[in-house]
A protein has these predicted regions:
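Short glycine-/polar-rich loops that comprise or flank the Walker A/P-loop
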Residues: 31-33, 105, 119-122, 159-163
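Conserved helicase/translocase motor-coupling segment
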Residues: 16-91
């Protein structure tokens, strides 16, 4: 896998210990990670479908297939929220893409479990969720037995050449810091920022524990200022979010 594709999984589950098997320059499709916001996307309640996201993903896939950079590339789509969205997308694929192309491109649409141990050159992730209310959605944590973290970990690491994160959310206002969905969206919008910020944290940290705390808070979406000066003293770090600040001594 390319470094950029294992970056999110490294951050989420492996404490940055996985080493990439391919060089970053070995893919001919750029950018390697794309965030695509469906501004009118809406989850249809208990059905756990987002028809506009489904339509957008199929339209993007068809557009890719027409470009020379994607000649011979295989495609996959992963729903991050249940099998009803899988059916919604699969129906559109069957309707809008020629069956010969479906076979030639080895198109697979499913959930994370369907892609365990499998890959495609180009992967589209459908987040499904939307927010029609004021204020952020309830926090999505790792789930019982780490189920959600495992789901996201697999989904974000199935692409060989390009990963699309297709969502209907404004990560800044619709999601809380630490929410799995926010972490994935933020990563997809600027994957290099995470590795760059981690290097800065490593330089400023005065102990391994302080480094681990600062990295975890940053990964969860907090703005971290290390070695905060207060008069003649220094605080290990201050975590900032909106109008709130918390001082942390390690």
């Amino acid at each position: 896998a390319l470094p950029i594709f294992i970056g999110f999984s490294n951050m989420l589950s492996y404490d940055f210990k996985i080493k990439p098997l391919r060089e970053a320059s070995s893919s001919n499709i750029m950018p390697a990670v794309v965030n695509y916001r469906v501004k009118d996307g809406e989850r249809t309640g208990s059905l756990k479908t987002n028809p506009r996201e489904a339509a957008t993903i199929v339209a993007l896939m068809k557009a890719c297939m027409e470009q020379k950079e994607y000649a011979g590339k295989t495609f996959g789509v992963i729903s991050l929220l249940g099998d009803n969205q899988v059916k919604e997308i699969q129906q559109r694929i069957d309707k809008e893409i020629d069956s010969k192309d479906i076979v030639a491109r080895n198109i697979l649409c499913g959930n994370s479990a369907n892609f365990q141990g499998d890959e495609r050159d180009v992967i589209f992730l459908s987040m499904v969720d939307s927010n029609e209310k004021s204020g952020p959605l309830p926090m999505m944590t790792y789930g019982v037995d780490d189920a959600y973290r495992k789901r996201y970990n697999v989904a974000a690491s199935r692409a060989r050449d390009q990963l699309w994160v297709v969502d209907s959310l404004d990560a800044a206002s619709d999601l809380k810091p630490g929410d799995l969905r926010k972490r994935l969206i933020d990563y997809s919008m600027n994957p290099k920022a995470f590795s760059n910020e981690h290097r800065k944290i490593e330089k400023k940290s005065e102990s391994p524990f302080e480094e681990a705390v600062a990295k975890n808070l940053f990964d969860c979406g907090y703005h971290i200022v290390q070695q905060w000066e207060v008069g003649a003293y220094r605080i290990d770090m201050v975590a900032l979010y909106k109008n709130s600040a918390v001082a942390i001594e390690c």
